[in-house]
Amino acid sequence: MSWFTPEVIDVILTVLRAIVVLLAVVVCGALLSFVERRLLGWWQDRYGPNRVGPFGMFQIAADMLKMFFKEDWNPPFVDRVIFTLAPVVAMSALLIAFVVIPITPTWGVADLNIGLLFFFAMAGLSVYAVLFAGWSSNNKYALLGSLRASAQTVSYEVFLGLALMGVVVQVGSFNMRDIVEYQAQNLWFIIPQFFGFCTFFIAGVAVTHRHPFDQPEAEQELADGYHIEYAGMKWGMFFVGEYIGIILISALLVTLFFGGWHGPFGILPQLSFLWFALKTAFFIMLFILLRASIPRPRYDQVMDFSWKFCLPLTLINLLVTAAIVLYNTPAVAAQ
């Protein structure tokens, strides 16, 4: 009896696809740190990193070597187990969330019927990582940063989910591939769900703690926030995890609102991976542009903006979408 049954082969292929996708995401996340510094230098009319290699391209290699060889030091006053676990959870939760994102019609790790719910579950785990990091550090600035992060993330995750319910109501499924295929037969959701797109993008920036919602890490106020006591690879996991979060939110925006791997008007369907990559790169650059152009608001303004503006907007969008879908349902229309 052969061990290589069709079921075993499917499992092996799924594991290999997962390894390829996760390695590609980690590499892209590391490269984004260099890309961000070059773009910020260009937009702010300064040089940026340009000394290591041609056009500074080897700067990322120098940074990685420095990170690998720095001492992995644990301060004597920290809770060692939780202190070590926090960066692992932060990076792992974001990486695992990629398994439900379809990149091309044939390439993806897992085709789950609860794909969106799986993403929300993984996004929720990242809150615990930040809270663990601040609490286990026994540092008042780290604790304050983690409490800020928890309150901000919980607030914005409320309408991070509600912003997508309009998409789910129209498609009738939480499956990512179903959502992409629905957009191929109809309008991309950027048009009928424009307000949902706006609120999801704002919530995505806040959940990834990117500027202008980087209150948990505000250098001027909190001395780098919840990872002030981290060094070496532990700090590197938080650092790369932030860029992985940018890629994740950008890929979700493309999948849910911009037709996924489909080109505009069905142009060149054979270039599905290229379309997905180009659209994702556009939103990644938009994340970086926000950092270069918008000042950081006060923490109370960030929280007021979420509850007093974004949440009502998502509820109105959901109610209007549900009413339109209900009105157009044949059974209801016949009555």
From Swiss-Prot:
Parts of the chain that traverse the membrane? 11-31, 81-101, 114-134, 154-174, 187-207, 238-258, 270-290, 307-327
Enzyme Commission number, as recorded: 7.1.1.-
**Highest taxon above the source species:** Bacteria
A Gene Ontology biological process term: aerobic respiration
What membrane topology was assigned to this protein in its record? Multi-pass membrane protein
Catalytic activity entry: a quinone + NADH + 5 H(+)(in) = a quinol + NAD(+) + 4 H(+)(out)
Localization recorded for this chain is: Cell inner membrane
Name a GO CC annotation attached to this entry: plasma membrane
Q: Which GO terms describe its molecular function?
A: NADH dehydrogenase activity; oxidoreductase activity, acting on NAD(P)H, quinone or similar compound as acceptor; quinone binding
* Record's keyword terms, sorted: Cell inner membrane, Cell membrane, Membrane, NAD, Quinone, Translocase, Transmembrane, Transmembrane helix, Ubiquinone
Query: Top enzyme class of this protein?
Result: translocase
Q: What does the function comment of this entry state?
A: NDH-1 shuttles electrons from NADH, via FMN and iron-sulfur (Fe-S) centers, to quinones in the respiratory chain. The immediate electron acceptor for the enzyme in this species is believed to be ubiquinone. Couples the redox reaction to proton translocation (for every two electrons transferred, four hydrogen ions are translocated across the cytoplasmic membrane), and thus conserves the redox energy in a proton gradient. This subunit may bind ubiquinone.
* UniProt subunit comment: NDH-1 is composed of 13 different subunits. Subunits NuoA, H, J, K, L, M, N constitute the membrane sector of the complex.
- Name the HAMAP family on file: NDH1_NuoH
Can you tell me which family this protein belongs to?
Answer: Belongs to the complex I subunit 1 family.
> What name appears for this protein in its UniProt entry?
NADH-quinone oxidoreductase subunit H
Q: Which organism is it from?
A: Pseudomonas putida (strain ATCC 47054 / DSM 6125 / CFBP 8728 / NCIMB 11950 / KT2440)
